[in-house]
Amino acid sequence: MDRAPVTTGPLDMPIMHDSDRYDFVKDIGSGNFGVARLMRDKLTKELVAVKYIERGDKIDENVQREIINHRSLRHPNIVRFKEVILTPTHLAIIMEYASGGELYERICNAGRFSEDEARFFFQQLLSGVSYCHSMQICHRDLKLENTLLDGSPAPRLKICDFGYSKSSVLHSQPKSTVGTPAYIAPEVLLRQEYDGKIADVWSCGVTLYVMLVGAYPFEDPEEPRDYRKTIQRILSVKYSIPDDIRISPECCHLISRIFVADPATRISIPEIKTHSWFLKNLPADLMNESNTGSQFQEPEQPMQSLDTIMQIISEATIPAVRNRCLDDFMTDNLDLDDDMDDFDSESEIDIDSSGEIVYAL
């Protein structure tokens, strides 16, 4: 499974002032959003992940949506939002640190999972997504790279990256096409108004398939980077399970109920949670989820108020004076993947270097 290259390394950019509460530990990633760093709380010694986004034009409605939606979610299977801080050059989003890394990397190292291990992570994924939906938030970009793991022996899955999420309370019904081609539901590709919750189910199904098979269900094995072909196969729901992969009939049935082109007849999350394959070996803490969110509160650290966050975001839209070295770094990391140079520039579809697809509506 291919993914876009990520550049990491020492970054010449301000961390935070010495008087602030976090100390720099190391760089942990970068992307089109900016950079991510591991920091340590000076008071509690807790490790946190900090996502830095350049002040100015990059602080758009997607960033605001990510922060506001993420702030409202408190669940064991969702990376915990802590606060936002304004630095001289960046908006810093402080989050829980998931020391186990990406589920994507775990699958790459293993090749594929056993059915029991895939079910273990799928149950947690469904728990987190179900909670999001109960809070009237659809994620819209569920994928392996957006599912992290904590460092425990039986890893707890953590959903992250709410940049494409949409709230039915705060926002209109989704209509734009966002996400990564391999995970996108057919109705989303058709650019019609759609139910983001049902589209999330499709993406969960892709994640389950990849855990079981070690490959994406709708990619052409001969031409995995041919996104047009991937899209065609999604629209026609053309997938198969390799003959050498042993999967139980119950699991195959669940996958066949998820990969349904018509969202009206696709299985829903409440229905998945009553499916015999899902219920097998279901952890006790996932059986009764009525108080899952409330038990995750942190009384010693009050949640940053919405007014404070909105004020910080507003200030972050004002560009800061920058040094040339940082400008060079950020520009270098926004170069498009050479593999996409020959893609039809006249196409209505915009696919970026990571394989993400966006229709601007």
From Swiss-Prot:
Catalytic activity: L-seryl-[protein] + ATP = O-phospho-L-seryl-[protein] + ADP + H(+); L-threonyl-[protein] + ATP = O-phospho-L-threonyl-[protein] + ADP + H(+)
UniProt entry keywords in alphabetical sequence: Abscisic acid signaling pathway, ATP-binding, Kinase, Nucleotide-binding, Serine/threonine-protein kinase, Transferase
UniProt cross-references to SMART domains, sorted A to Z: S_TKc
InterPro entries for the chain: Kinase-like_dom_sf, Prot_kinase_dom, Protein_kinase_ATP_BS, Ser/Thr_kinase_AS
Residues of the Protein kinase domain: 22-278
Transmembrane segments annotated in the record for this chain: none
Cross-referenced Pfam families: Pkinase (PF00069)
Keyword RNA-binding set for record: no
Record Gene3D superfamilies: Phosphorylase Kinase, domain 1 (3.30.200.20), Transferase(Phosphotransferase) domain 1 (1.10.510.10)
GO biological process: one example: response to water deprivation
CDD domains: STKc_SnRK2-3
Binding site for ATP: I28, G29, S30, G31, N32, F33, G34, V35, A36, K51
Tissue specificity comment: Expressed at low levels in seeds, seedlings, roots (especially in tips), stems, leaves, shoots, flowers and siliques.
Record-linked PROSITE patterns: PROTEIN_KINASE_ATP, PROTEIN_KINASE_DOM, PROTEIN_KINASE_ST
EC supergroup of this enzyme: transferase
GO molecular function, one term: ATP binding
GO cellular component term, pick one: nucleus
Enzyme Commission number(s) of this protein: 2.7.11.1
Activity control: Activated by autophosphorylation of its activation loop.
Active-site residues (renumbered): D141
PTM per Swiss-Prot/TrEMBL: Autophosphorylated in vitro.
Family stated for the protein in its record: Belongs to the protein kinase superfamily. Ser/Thr protein kinase family.
Annotated PANTHER family: SERINE/THREONINE KINASE, SERINE_THREONINE-PROTEIN KINASE SRK2I
Role description: Together with SRK2D, key component and activator of the abscisic acid (ABA) signaling pathway that regulates numerous ABA responses, such as seed germination, Pro accumulation, root growth inhibition, dormancy and seedling growth, and, to a lesser extent, stomatal closure. In response to ABA, phosphorylates the ESCRT-I complex component FREE1, which is required for ABA-induced FREE1 nuclear import.
Identification of the protein by name: Serine/threonine-protein kinase SRK2I
Record gene name: SRK2I
